[in-house]
Amino acid sequence: MSNTTTARLLSAALLLSVSAAQAQDALLTKAKAYVVSATAPVTKCNGPTTGPKAAAGKSVIYISGDGNNGGITGVAAGVKEAAGVIGWTYRQIDGRGTVAGHSTAMGQAIALKPSAIVVGGFDAAEQADLITQADKAGIVVVAWHAGPQSGPIATPKIFTNVTTPIESTATAAAYYAIANSDGKAGVVVFTDSTARIAMAKANAMADIIKTCKTCTLLEIRNQAIAGAIPAMPQVTSSLLQKYGNKWNYSLAINDIYFDGMVPALSAAGIKPTGQLINISAGDGSISAYQRIRDGQYQDATIPEPLNLQGWQLVDEINRALAGQKPSNYSIPVHLVTKANINADGGDKNLFDPQNNYRAEYRKIWGK
């Protein structure tokens, strides 16, 4: 090989190296800017400002996918509160975290002939036949976390599905890991393959971590949410043996994984802060807020505005009853860390934006 050819190859390699470094610097800058935006106070109400006045004498049944899940019960509280304001009767049925339980709850709700049913936290495809039965009976069906995307679901027919876009949630969690580690995160992603929204969120987080050339995606670990707390000690011990110090960041689709992980981390001598950074891309449970506030094995969570989403579900039902289209409202993603944990309802261990959303919905409904 001639000296000229060698020089050209070295020059090309150098250019590639410089280009890769520039791309990595750009990613870090973007990630850090995104984190700043996602942790900012939420003071502006960017939801709907017009809509139909309140329909009179209506009833709504909230089917809780699992009465032990903090996110599901938080939305239920919002639906109940908003139903009281708009003047409707409210009832809740617990699906008890199983497919059979969801089926039983759906059947009971349909038999009661309410004006509307809220599918609260389980996949619409799982109960397609019963949702279709409700629609044919003239019952409005809306949902929270019944599919991977917000907005109407065509099959089975759901007027609208309320959820924070998974792309936004995944981006906030993954970018926090990239920014906080300065591009050196070794990541395990925890998800539940039984739910489409969980898998979509996990895959989106994994794809973003892969764009960080100096980060490492160690594994996407499947563990059902329903059995996460008793299973996670053994799962955690196994992962620590497998990866050791290479595992320094966790991205989970729900805080509940960290509820079960803490005992194993403590027993293994893992420091509560700085050694294994745990980030949840969803839920914002009370225990997660407490861990973040106390610096105990969790750095961040991405809570949804559960009470606000409950109010939105009631508003969406009211739009459906009036023959109008869904509002297609979705609040921007919000990242909670120790630095901002006491803002926007965080002092009460929840994300409740201080943007007067209750007053805005009352104005729309004439209440």
Model-derived features: where do they sit?
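Gram-negative bacterial Sec-dependent N-terminal signal peptides
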Residues: 1-23
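A residue-level marker of the well-folded mature domains of exported/periplasmic proteins
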Residues: 18, 23-367
